[in-house]
């Protein structure tokens, strides 16, 4: 795996009682898994000391779009209530598929946390190593968290439209190829098929192996094979802003500069009849 932003289960087990470490459970149901009660899954068993980082609950509920970043002050209050301290080393994990931990990693970094790592292999890897789980909620004292939002981390639909029209940035779409190529319907109702004109398709699952990123050589080969240049600004997108963070994490691991996330993603673009799509029908 690529280790820049990752820690292993053995390392975390050794440091689990370190007061400068905080563990964050960021597992999340993907589209089509609406019947899952992820909060209950957390209560049924999580890494000892981990608080539950509910990406759905921590999104902007004033927006009709899913998983949009909340206001900085809203996020800061939520983190303080969870007991999260922004000056500690935060270790984020998901169920072990690397589906949602990168989104939590990106949110925390975008709101000013400097030390954030992802547990390679996630909860599944922890359990494979026969390490113990804890049941029930984790109650911590109020944390110290003052969100310092980085506006350079995210772009809006107008920025993406300009990049698509003027070719000023590469747009990478992390959705599966069948959705990108308009061969199947979107899992969310009411969205058109297709992709943003000029976008390149790098499905997030191709970057991942057993809950970790592939090696840097493998990542380079995948990006180069899809026509991505590291010398040009990059905008990452997906269905709702979650798996785009996997692509962003991979590019960060490769030290690629000037990468931003389109938070509205296809949930916004695909819902608007006034925006262009490819392939044309």
From Swiss-Prot:
Q: Where in the cell is it found?
A: Cytoplasm
Q: Which GO terms describe its molecular function?
A: 3-mercaptopyruvate sulfurtransferase activity; thiosulfate-cyanide sulfurtransferase activity
| EC class | transferase
* Record-listed substrate binding positions: 179
Rhodanese domain sequence ranges: 17-135, 165-278
What Gene3D superfamilies would the database entry show? Rhodanese-like domain
Entries under CDD domains matching the protein = TST_Repeat_1, TST_Repeat_2
What role does it play? Catalyzes the transfer of sulfur from 3-mercaptopyruvate to a thiol-containing acceptor to form an intramolecular disulfide releasing hydrogen sulfide and pyruvate.
The protein in question is named 3-mercaptopyruvate sulfurtransferase
What is this protein's gene name?
A: sseA
Region of interest (Substrate specificity), residue spans: 238-244
Under InterPro entries, the record lists: Rhodanese-like_dom, Rhodanese-like_dom_sf, Thiosulphate_STrfase_CS, TST/MPST-like
List the EC numbers from the record: 2.8.1.2
Q: Which reaction does it catalyse?
A: 2-oxo-3-sulfanylpropanoate + [thioredoxin]-dithiol = [thioredoxin]-disulfide + hydrogen sulfide + pyruvate + H(+)
Gene Ontology cellular component list: cytosol
- The active site lies at 238
Instruction: Quote the record's domain comment.
Output: The N-terminal region is the non-catalytic domain; the C-terminus contains the active-site cysteine residue and the CGSGVTA motif probably responsible for substrate specificity.
The alphabetized UniProt keywords are: Cytoplasm, Repeat, Transferase
Q: Name one Pfam family in it.
A: Rhodanese
